[in-house]
Amino acid sequence: MSTVDQSTVTTALSSSSSNRHQGNDTYSIPKHSGTTSTITITMNEVSFVKSYLSTLDSRPIKLRSDHVFDPEQVGLRVPYTLPRLHAPHPEMPKKTKQPLAPGSSKSITVHLKSARNPALEFSLPNTALTTTSVQDLKDAVRERVTDAQGNKISLDKIKILYKRKPVTGKTIAEVLADEPVRLSGGKEVEFGVMIIGGAQVAVSAGAGERASAEQKESYEPPKPAVGPSGESVVATEAFWDDLQGFLEQRLKDYDEANKLRVLFKEAWRSSF
């Protein structure tokens, strides 16, 4: 059997005229040049060709490596499902500031200064390093300035600067983390203030600043109290009674306070 195209053989088997004689079929198969060629095929060959073609039809169609599917004609092979939503996370508990014992937190004097628009300068004495946040400084500035209509300035427009750069820490201690001398407490630090869009000093704040300045100028140190002082006070029983009362209040123990009173009094007498 000569080698011919599969479709050509199929067409010839189905539609071409045939002459059956002595168990043989004669088919006219067209050539590529337009002429026809007559070949003789036995019935066994016909059965083989039909079985071969049916085998080819049952096999999957092979596609080229660069074949592209039309997305409008090809449906999804798997159903499209939305991702499962996670359960909502519980809200974080709000942090409450616990009052610290007196003397447990180091303090510092904070000077806030705005060079222009508005020209503002004030101080916050005895400011705790670890508990005072940058937000607290913004609140202090916000209380002293207003916009052109007399309304409060938004906190987003108030910027706190340190060494001419916006601060990045949340508390004063974090801002001064690289300055251990200031973190020791008892020092002074100056922060710059910048208000986006400008502002003006509030009338109440200006009056308060002037009153504070006048109060400082008119301040006179109190005169010393007239009366016994020094060793003459220690020699009195009233002094030791007061000392014992203080110790009882702190220790909650009368016997221990009395014992310490005697011990301190004997030590004081032995110093002469």
From Swiss-Prot:
Keyword flag Transmembrane: no
Sorted UniProt keywords: Cytoplasm, Transport
Ranges of residues in domain Ubiquitin-like: 108-198
GO cellular component, one term: cytosolic small ribosomal subunit
Main localization, broad class: cytoplasm
Region entry Disordered, spans: 1-35, 85-105, 212-231
Gene3D superfamilies: Get5 dimerization domain (1.10.286.70)
InterPro entries in the cross-refs: Get5_C (IPR049256), Get5_N (IPR024737)
Subcellular location: Cytoplasm
Pfam families: Get5_C, Get5_N
Subunit structure: Forms homodimers via its C-terminal domain. Component of the get4/get5/sgt2 sorting complex. Binds directly sgt12 homodimers.
Free-text note regarding domains: The C-terminal region (residues 201 to 272) is involved in homodimerization.
PANTHER family found in the cross-reference section: 40S RIBOSOMAL PROTEIN S30/UBIQUITIN-LIKE PROTEIN FUBI, UBIQUITIN-LIKE DOMAIN-CONTAINING PROTEIN
Function text: Component of the get4/get5/sgt2 sorting complex involved in the GET (guided entry of TA proteins) pathway that leads to the insertion of tail-anchored (TA) proteins into the endoplasmic reticulum. Get4 and get5 form an obligate complex that catalyzes the transfer of tail-anchored proteins destined to the endoplasmic reticulum from sgt2 to the cytosolic targeting factor which then targets the TA protein to the ER membrane via get1/get2.
Homology family: Belongs to the GET5 family.
Protein name from the UniProt record: Golgi to ER traffic protein 5
